[in-house]
C-alpha cells in the first residue's frame, strides 16, 4: 500500500508542477505572439488604400494673376 501512495504523491507533484509551468509559460507566449502581430496589422492597415475624395477647388491667386499649369501666373497686358 505504501508503494501506491508514494506513486500517487509523485504523480500529483508532477502534475501540479506542470500545471504551474503552463500557467507561467502560456501567457508569455501569447503576449509575444500579440506583439509580433501588432506591426503586421499596422502594415496591412497602411497597405489597404482607402478611397480618397479629391475635390478640385481652384486655388486663389492674387489680383492681376491667373492660375495656369498649377501655378499662379501674372498676366502682363
UniProtKB/Swiss-Prot annotation:
Propiece residue ranges: 33-52
Claim: Membrane is one of the keywords in the record: no
Region forming the signal peptide: 1-32
Keyword Signal assigned: yes
InterPro entries in alphabetical order: Secapin
Annotated disulfide bonds: 61-72
Similarity remark: Belongs to the secapin family.
Protein known as: Secapin
Biological source species: Apis cerana cerana (Oriental honeybee)
Amino acid at each position: 500500500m505504501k508503494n501506491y501512495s508514494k506513486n500517487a504523491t509523485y504523480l500529483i507533484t508532477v502534475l501540479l508542477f506542470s500545471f504551474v509551468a503552463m500557467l507561467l509559460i502560456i501567457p508569455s507566449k501569447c503576449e509575444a505572439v500579440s506583439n509580433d502581430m501588432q506591426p503586421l496589422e499596422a502594415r496591412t492597415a497602411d497597405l489597404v488604400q482607402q478611397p480618397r475624395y479629391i475635390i478640385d477647388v481652384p486655388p486663389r491667386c492674387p489680383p492681376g494673376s491667373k492660375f495656369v499649369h498649377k501655378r499662379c501666373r501674372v498676366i502682363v497686358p
